[in-house]
Amino acid sequence: MSEMTVDGKNVKTEYETDANYNGSVTGTEANPMGYLIDKVFKTGGNATVENTETLWKNSSTALREFATKLSAKTLTSSVADNHKTDFKSGNATTGANECKQGFWFLMDTTADPKGTVNANAIESQSIPMLLATKLVNPTDQDAPDYAGATANLGTVTLKANEPSINKEITKVNKADADSKTKMNARIGDTITYTLTTTIPDYTGYVDGSRVLQLIDTAAHGLKDVTVTKVKVGDTELNEDADADNNGYVLKRDKNQIDPLDNCNKADATVTTVDLAHYVNTNDNIASGATVTVTLTAVVDSDAVIAGVGNPNTVELAYSRTPSGEKHQVPGPTVRVYTYDFSIYKTNMAGDTALSGAQFAIARVDSNAETFMTQDAATKAWKNLTTAKPAADADEGVFTTSADGKIAMSGLPAGEYHVYEIKAPDGYTSIGLPDFKFTITPTFDTAGTTVTSVAYEKTTNTDGNRVSFGTGETASMAQIKNAKNLTELPMTGDLGIKVFVTVGVLLMAAGAAFALSARMRA
């Protein structure tokens, strides 16, 4: 009471001078609680104290302030056994608790009740409150309430919040995601994630101790994690918490041990959006409003290929008790997957690796082809155009090295078209192979870990000069080159291509010979 003021007046001082309630003034029995109920807890218009629904939901009312301060006092000092009793919600079948008639202070002391939505969640405790017992009718002990009582005395509904947080993949580059929990991506792609939770009702929670943090952990294959927007409802918050009440603090730690599956490198990125400033200093907290955090990450060359993918998790840290006890609850894990592909160039016998062969690769989407290039240093992919690159072009040309190989790691599942655009030195350029293929993963029963990846040709126009390996070489396409026409198969589509090409060359040669002969004549 001594810590409370109403209308600028100290409540304890006012009580001590009121002869109607302070027994020391008149020598009668002291009634401090009666004074509080009659003089302090009533709202404007002299409303009766039993109309408390709005009073309890408003942290600024005297009734709420008194309960909050009494709760803090109770936590730091002992209460005699003869002045307290244990109440239990839903006791027996009626929910009734036996206690002395009077006015009781009710404080939730439930320890770590587990949530029903998430086994790791812990429901927040109900706020402290003041509650009157039912009034006993002195002439009829079996009557439920004293005759003429208008208030619903002796009953309270305790509402414990079970906090939760959600996370979704919403975009890959500029395209909407086709799944909210797992996505295919290339190295170099930018992934957009959306985190959502709800602002709790902090009525009765001590200012300065309220906790609300959204904690994002990105696996080591996801870099450049950037928070692009934080909103409460439709209001965008500022990163600088000191700017105004609509602020938050952003914390980043890039040297955390990755707790996700088999990703154990010590460079996972932990990003914390701390809303402590908003929930502790804002007088108009939007309780029940949706908190939306948008962030991006880039798939880089450290990305896990297939397997468990590249997970991204989220946790919510919140105040479990009105005194500010903190607890964390996990949200869903979302994953980004990427896959290997490589080329191995050989002679027709398959026993000699060939360097200097040039290729182009296009992503096929509904028969539309978009050619791609890959940065040699970062391994990041980017789109070019629908036009096939020419041999020796600056972008989009992949050349076999001395071992005859080209690594094209970091591709999403889907369909591709590979073109050989330049033969190795000493090999014919007639009928250069091109082929389409698909990358198709198979997941475990949980749908989170890739157990196998199938690489399959979807065209057969190469004269069986292209084949995928098995086991460890399943992602490698062996492509054979012929030195001359006699090594090329002359059946099927390839045979037609060769005959047409040779025919065109012969026609061109014949036309040139005829022109030369005419000029000599």
Put a short name on every predicted segment:
Residues M1-A521:
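Solvent-exposed loop/turn and edge beta-strand elements of beta-rich ligand-binding domains
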